[in-house]
């Protein structure tokens, strides 16, 4: 008599897991500062939640992460590292260290850092993610630019250039076509959001990036796929 209840329990747990997996949480670490009384990190569920004082580049990254795929991410958590654009290495190191410490107790699934390659921190983040997963059992993943996917917690994104074309309407009604070009590190937030918005029941391998008009194209697709790139 006990077997049916066990089977039902497994089915219910599986259904719950699928539901939980429909919308993941993205975390962004950005070189920006939140003005009081805002609390760092800030949680963004809709665009209305984006603080007014953030840099345009930060806002753009948040919006990229929020696009998602089948679904939008459940939310985007934005941690402002307080690092100036022209900061020295010591300040950059300190900012990243604080971000790591703060993120250890925050629930999220996918991490992206729009300046991680510029800051020369990709390998440090890869090491941190591996430690979080293997030692502290926090099953997070990071989307990193041009970083070997030698661990299940590392998602290697390598496309050199992605171009978004959109039509902007001025106050006088004049329409202008504007191209926005993203480097590899700048588009990692989009990839993190896409994966977070992919239900467990489907794959995102060939997910369309409908906002793009152009990107760096591969002459040979087999080698990157074989290498999980």
Predicted regions, residues:
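Short, flexible coil/turn micro-motifs enriched in small/turn-prone residues
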Residues: 16-19, 41, 192
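N-terminal leader/targeting segments
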Residues: 22, 28-31
């Amino acid at each position: 008599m006990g077997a049916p209840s066990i089977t039902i329990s497994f089915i219910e747990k599986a259904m719950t897991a699928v539901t939980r997996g429909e919308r993941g949480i993205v975390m962004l670490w950005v070189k920006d500062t939140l003005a009081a009384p805002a609390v760092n990190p800030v949680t963004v569920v809709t665009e209305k939640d984006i603080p007014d004082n953030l840099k345009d580049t930060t806002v753009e990254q948040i919006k990229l992460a929020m696009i998602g795929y089948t679904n939008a991410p459940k939310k985007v958590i934005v941690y402002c590292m307080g690092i100036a654009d022209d900061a020295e290495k010591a300040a950059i190191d300190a900012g990243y260290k604080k971000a790591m410490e703060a993120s250890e107790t925050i629930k999220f699934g996918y991490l992206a850092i729009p300046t991680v390659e510029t800051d020369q921190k990709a390998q440090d983040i890869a090491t941190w993610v591996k430690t979080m997963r293997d030692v502290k059992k926090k099953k997070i993943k990071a989307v990193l630019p041009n970083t070997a996917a030698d661990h299940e917690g590392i998602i290697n994104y390598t496309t050199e250039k992605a171009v978004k074309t959109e039509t902007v309407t001025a106050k006088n009604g004049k329409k202008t076509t504007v191209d926005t070009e993203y480097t590899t590190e700048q588009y990692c937030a989009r990839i993190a959001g896409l994966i977070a918005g992919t239900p467990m029941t489907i794959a995102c391998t060939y997910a369309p990036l409908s906002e793009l008009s152009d990107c760096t194209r591969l002459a040979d697709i087999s080698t990157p796929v074989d290498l999980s790139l």
